[in-house]
Amino acid sequence: MQYTEIMIRYGELSTKGKNRKDFINRLASNVQKVLHDFPDLKIQTHHDRMHILLNGTPFEPVNDRLKVVFGIQTYSPVIKTEKSLEAIEKTALELMQATYKAGMTFKVNTRRSDHKFIYDTNQLNQMVADYLYNHMEGLQAEMKHPDMVLLLEIRQDGAYISNQLLHGAGGMPVGTAGKAVMMLSGGIDSPVASYLAMKRGVNIEMVHFFSPPYTSEKALAKAKELTSILAKYSGRINFIEVPFAEIQETIKEKLPEGYLMTVQRRFMLRLADIIREKRHALAIFNGESVGQVASQTLESMSAINDVTTTPVLRPVATMDKTEIIAKAEEIGTFDLSIQPFEDCCTIFAPPRPKTKPKIDKAREYESRLDVDGLIERALAGVKVTPIYPGQSFLDDLDEEDADLL
């Protein structure tokens, strides 16, 4: 049976008071963006619901896109009909006949925002259920845990009937919390942190440090492909490449081994902060988890954060590694994250880094370096690439390699 539209129920938008309209408009824009290649769809927004008119478009391919849009609490494919008992009963029967299977239990659940409608919710539940019993064989009612719930919603403009209540991605529409930069490595943690930042409405741009010839083109392609996976949640993400080899070489040559990691991270944070300012962003996100590695002790974080007053936010800070891995598997980044391409965080990793570095020591060692010159030359090599959902980078690189053989 052909659904006529999709009814979307907002999540936390219902609590946003005077900003509610802006949040709803942003959600509509994000939905429009992910459904841009379905020309027959039409989006209508209301204060408590959004409607996507399908106009003949099948529900399933639209559902595949819609389920990853942040800001949607639940949604249902519905059939809209006129607000009369006869039309409601007829449409309910057609939907049940098309989807009900022998042995399933069901119940009718009615909501009514039009309180002037002649029947109340209990009456509608009973009358529609009786009608179905009289026109179908073998129906079994179950009030607590039915296999199918027939949803009726009586609104001012008509009656909406569905047999599915689907859970959306939740959270806030991407863009409603402003823009930030994300320090993206090629590992497991930072893609999960990116997902969680977007879920809170943050529009993120990826900052990725690479160090050719020490890091390969495949390591860079891997980071871009991780960004492509995450882009399905926002429609597009800008990927910012920052060359980092000269800085790493200089630090390794001139500073004590125990402070290599701390000073490298301080340079990364400086660069991310300058890029943030140039990109008109408000904060810096990363994938650090407290105590997971030497650079992620509170003492290390404090010594690294010393170079900026910009908020540095860590969405996975209190998560166990097993929790982060589970989320990475859920969002589809795990298998790619564990591909063995070394990134710049691992190639110069000292065997015995300081786990409790001192801020004054880090400052003293940096005074031996041409910090401004190193930063300036790294920024001169920055490259920005817009990345879209579904783009492939590793496969394209493999094809280029094959062409050379």
Swiss-Prot record:
Listed SUPFAM superfamilies: Adenine nucleotide alpha hydrolases-like, THUMP domain-like
GO cellular component: cytosol
Record-annotated THUMP domain positions: 60-165
Pfam families in alphabetical order: ThiI, ThiI_fer, THUMP
Compartmental location: Cytoplasm
Gene Ontology MF terms: ATP binding; CCA tRNA nucleotidyltransferase activity; tRNA binding; tRNA-uracil-4 sulfurtransferase activity
Alphabetical list of CDD domains matching this protein: PPase_ThiI (cd01712), THUMP_ThiI (cd11716)
Gene Ontology BP annotations: thiamine biosynthetic process; thiamine diphosphate biosynthetic process; thiazole biosynthetic process; tRNA 4-thiouridine biosynthesis
UniProt key word Phosphoprotein: no
Domain of life: Bacteria
EC number(s) recorded for this UniProt protein: 2.8.1.4
Name of the featured protein: Probable tRNA sulfurtransferase
Gene that specifies this protein: thiI
